[in-house]
Design a protein with these regions (language model features):
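Coiled-coil heptad-register positions
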Residues: 39, 46, 74-77, 81-84, ...
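Short, structured motif recognition centered on aromatic/hydrophobic residues
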Residues: 28-31, 102-107, 177, 181
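Extracytoplasmic/periplasmic, Sec-exported soluble proteins
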Residues: 16-19, 23, 58, 98, ...
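Post-signal peptide N-terminal segment of secreted/secretory-pathway proteins
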Residues: 1-48
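Extended amphipathic alpha-helical interaction segments
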Residues: 56-174
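A cross-kingdom marker for long, charged
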Residues: 136-226
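Polar/charged, Q/E/K-enriched amphipathic alpha-helical segments with strong coiled-coil propensity
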Residues: 32, 36-64, 192-207
Length: 226
């Protein structure tokens, strides 16, 4: 925690995010101290649980104060990440790194699909309430981006430019992402909820789409980052 506060005073300046880190320090430090006391305390029942009541009062007050800032902080981090990703994708496109660009863009669209669902308050337990208006637009963009990715990987000169020897660096994973999204759309259009009673993520569920997206991210990191 001390390191986080110290970094908030250092360059680069992240403006409001630095301020939020400092605002979270006091309630978070109080929570950490209280939990540390609880872990070493054996007298909960003494004095009609008075000590436990004192702990709870500190936890409730500071948890609310921390959460009020923490959620905004997480949103701010996400927004900053989106901006930086957009800048990186623009750079890749301008430099003609079309395989890398389209792979990254496909993954970004996948994240936008999940963001859209969650912004609507949707999960797999109320998936049939998902408004597909924006989802369909994202689907069409994803199809176009994956088509551009396939065209770029079919170009030997482009493979050489990006130092790739494999013309199928994603082994069809991006096509699988399209399929996973189309299964969601069909599931919603059916009016039925996906069967979540099994051990795996069923086709047509957000959980399955998230799993496939995770595979794409792992492959991207293997091909372009690692």
């Amino acid at each position: 925690l001390d390191d986080c506060v110290m970094l908030a005073d250092m360059e680069p300046d992240f403006g409001e995010m630095d301020s939020m880190v400092k605002e979270m320090e006091e309630p978070l430090r109080a929570l950490m101290g209280t939990f540390l006391e609880i872990s070493g305390s054996n007298d909960y029942a003494d004095n009609q649980y008075q000590k436990a009541k004192e702990y709870h009062a500190v936890i409730y007050a500071n948890a609310d104060a921390f959460a009020a800032i923490a959620y905004d902080f997480v949103d701010a981090v996400g927004e900053m990440g989106d901006v930086r990703m957009a800048e990186e994708e623009n750079r890749l496109k301008e430099e003609g790194m079309l395989i890398n660009y389209n792979a990254s863009r496909a993954i970004s669209i996948g994240r936008e699909v999940l963001d859209e669902a969650y912004a609507q308050g949707i999960d797999d337990w109320n998936l049939n309430e998902l408004d597909l208006t924006e989802i369909r637009k994202l689907h069409d963009e994803l199809v176009a981006v994956v088509a551009d990715f396939d065209a770029a990987t079919a170009d030997n000169d482009q493979l050489v430019k990006e130092s790739l020897s494999n013309s199928r660096p994603f082994d069809g994973l991006l096509d699988g992402l399209i399929d996973a999204l189309e299964w969601i759309m069909k599931q919603v259009e059916s009016g039925e909820l996906p069967d979540m009673s099994g051990s795996g993520a069923p086709l047509g569920s957000l959980e399955h789409f998230s799993y496939v997206l995770g595979q794409c991210i792992d492959r991207y990191n293997t091909v372009f980052v690692d």
